[in-house]
UniProtKB/Swiss-Prot annotation:
Domain of life: Eukaryota
Taxonomic path: Eukaryota, Fungi, Dikarya, Basidiomycota, Agaricomycotina
Name this polypeptide is given: Laccase-like protein claX
InterPro entries attached to this UniProt entry: Cu-oxidase_2nd, Cu-oxidase_C, Cu-oxidase_fam, Cupredoxin
Species annotation: Ampulloclitocybe clavipes
Gene transcribed to yield this protein: claX
Family membership: Belongs to the multicopper oxidase family.
Function per UniProt: Laccase-like protein; part of the gene cluster that mediates the biosynthesis of clavilactone A, a meroterpenoid that features a unique benzo-fused ten-membered carbocyclic ring unit with an alpha,beta-epoxy-gamma-lactone moiety, forming an intriguing 10/5/3 tricyclic nested skeleton. ClaR, ClaS and ClaT are sufficient to produce clavilactone A and the function of claX, if any, has still to be identified. The biosynthesis begins with the prenyltransferase claS that transfers geranyl pyrophosphate (GPP) to hydroquinone to produces geranylhydroquinon.
Pfam families: Cu-oxidase (PF00394), Cu-oxidase_2 (PF07731)
GO MF terms held by the record: copper ion binding; oxidoreductase activity
SUPFAM superfamilies: Cupredoxins (SSF49503)
Length: 417
């Protein structure tokens, strides 16, 4: 039994929140002193426009939208905007805090760092890990990490770090969380975006109530960074994957300048009868699904390996497009095998292309695919009535049914909405 952090992703515009299940018998409880609501950090992205114009612009140009700002516990600033208060976490010297960091973004990738402090990762996506000391953590949308931060008694003064070079200015209010470059989008396309304004505050008892006065940093010593590498994560309790019974290769190709992803040279096209409706009706043969549904049938109680080769970019001009990749992994008894089950990351995109770990790979439920290639394994032994991939949806345009979902709400006076 371990302490579990669950995040339910949603749309660009929607409610976001975590479910924290605390384990009174956490085997790593001796590593920290404080683990409560004050140490939950929900980082996210803020969008001033709705998905409707964002989607229209993406489809027309192929240019990936960029958020207006990053937030910590719902608070953040944008360039030229109001100086809203940053989220503050009050700490006491000499204590060890378990930070539960959750990336609730629709798109943003964040680099998490704390001025003059190391982070010790002990959990990834609800799976306990061997302690891993780092300066910073890169987090994809949907990922969760628990990291311990110590507040040494010798830090009675105040120190600040610049992003690259160490500075010796002094403050007792430290930048807590900083925004990284944004995945698949160019921040210069959104003038509201200023990565240095996406931060929270770790405030020592007795510290002045002021904003951080330093730029982004990557932890205590930028000259000797302890860079975070996903492949270095090891499970606290090892449960190595079995030999795969089924091997699937998914070549993902992004067409530059167009809103199109291809999976094995197939661009997803929505069928007349939705894929999930077919599954719920009992479809369990390849002939029941169109090629453009990207549907794979899997045996029950098997080990599945999916290989994502290094991704390539192409400048082909497509005749059709999709805004997202949907891959249905259908079992003969419909179960949700991927990604709601944790999978072993036997080859992380963070490692060299020839580094494969089948001895003690980390298990998690969100990982990256990209230039180095990724290989995951999972077992089809968790039978539930669902199937398919989870995703943050920006591709669904509102229709009459959507508009009619909340007529009672729309009829309320504006003061009550």
């Amino acid at each position: 039994m371990i302490t579990l952090t669950i995040f339910s992703p949603t749309d660009f515009q929607g409610l976001r929140g975590p479910l924290i299940i605390y384990d009174p018998e956490d085997p790593q409880k001796h590593l920290y002193d404080v683990d409560d609501e004050s140490t939950i950090f929900q980082v996210g992205d803020s969008w001033h426009n709705s998905t409707v114009p964002l989607l229209a612009g993406y489809v027309a140009t192929g240019i990936v939208p960029v958020s207006d700002s990053g937030t910590v516990d719902g608070a953040g600033r944008f360039q030229g905007g109001p100086a809203v208060p940053f989220a503050v976490t009050n700490v006491v010297k000499g204590q060890r805090y378990r930070l539960r960091i959750i990336n609730q973004s629709a798109r943003n990738v964040f680099t998490i760092s704390i001025d003059k402090h190391f982070l010790t990762i002990i959990e990834a996506d609800g799976v306990a890990t061997q302690p891993l000391l780092v300066n910073e953590i890169e987090m994809l949308a949907g990922q969760r990490y628990s990291a311990i931060v110590s507040t040494p008694p010798q830090l009675s003064g105040s120190l600040a770090l610049e992003l690259i070079n160490m500075a010796h200015s002094f403050t007792q209010t430290r930048p807590l969380i900083n925004n990284a470059p944004f995945v698949s989008g160019d921040p210069s396309r959104n003038l509201n975006q200023n990565a240095t304004l996406s931060r929270g505050i770790l405030r020592y008892a007795g510290g002045r109530r002021e904003d951080p006065r330093t730029p982004m940093t990557l932890g205590p010593d930028p000259t000797n960074p302890l860079a975070f590498v996903e492949a270095n994560l090891k499970p606290l309790v090892n449960n190595p994957p079995g030999i795969p019974d089924v091997n699937i290769t998914l070549n993902l190709v992004v067409t530059t300048g167009a809103a199109q992803w291809n999976v094995n040279n197939v661009s997803y096209l929505p069928p007349v009868v939705p894929t999930l409706v077919k599954i719920l009706a009992g479809a369990d043969e390849p002939a029941n699904f169109n090629v453009t549904e990207n549907t794979f049938l899997l045996p029950v109680n098997a080990t599945i390996q999916i290989t994502f080769p290094p991704m390539l970019m192409t400048k082909l001009t497509p005749s059709t497009y999709t805004e997202y990749v949907t891959i249905f992994l259908i079992l003969l008894h419909p179960i949700d095998a991927f990604p709601k089950n944790n999978f072993w990351v036997v080859k992380s995109n963070s490692s060299d292309s020839d580094v494969i770990n089948t001895i003690d790979p980390i298990k998690r439920d969100v990982t990256a695919v990209g230039a180095e290639g990724t290989i995951v394994r999972f077992t089809t032994d968790n039978i539930v009535m669902a199937s398919g991939t989870d995703e943050v949806r920006t591709d669904v345009e509102p229709d009459a049914a959507w508009e009619g979902l909340c007529p009672a709400y729309d009829a309320l006076p504006s003061a009550l909405q």
